[in-house]
Amino acid sequence: MDSINMTEKEKMTKGLMYDSFDEELCKDRTEARELIHRFNNSMDKLERKDITKQLFGSTGEKIYIEPTLRVDYGYNIHVGENFFANFGTIFLDTCPITIGKNAMLAPNVQFYSATHPIDPTERNSGLELGRPITIGDNVWIGGGVIILPGVELGDNVVVGAGAVVTKSFGSNVVIAGNPAKIIKQIPVKSE
């Protein structure tokens, strides 16, 4: 499909330049904020789980997220079975953010699929863009980690606390630092 014939929402989720002040996108963000407000103010974990299932694009059955949670839209977030996120998780989900099964997120983990043009003229036009983030299975992400647009992490990755992940990494590694780099390989035990 030609981008001229796409809605701003379609452009956004495909990582193309889009107008974030589009009426449909503004409405979507408002609806997400209303659900997030209910989620963050609920003491009932079953109610929070139900809200998450309404908000996210897809989830496994076994998920647990501690308040507070922040999202842009919610519908571009996809998490697998056995997902745990501690408090302070942020998803800037202009593009899809996909996380596999058996993921553990420590406090204050941030996923930024949103970005802005580097060229100042384009940036000042108000148009934005994004790049998807994809995280594999069996991943543990430490406290305060920031994952930037376009990053892909393989299976069995451990991300050290405070890391800023600016590029993609394969499976079975421990990464840490700013910018994140491989600290060591993880030997995989056969089952």
UniProtKB/Swiss-Prot annotation:
Keywords: Acyltransferase, Transferase. It is an enzyme of class 2 (transferase). One of its GO terms (molecular function) is O-acyltransferase activity. Coiled coil: none annotated. Its EC number is 2.3.1.-. InterPro entries: Hexapep, Hexapeptide_acetyltransf, Mac_dom, Trimer_LpxA-like_sf. It comes from the Eukaryota. Pfam families: Hexapep, Mac. Belongs to the transferase hexapeptide repeat family. This is Putative acetyltransferase DDB_G0280825. It comes from Dictyostelium discoideum (Social amoeba).
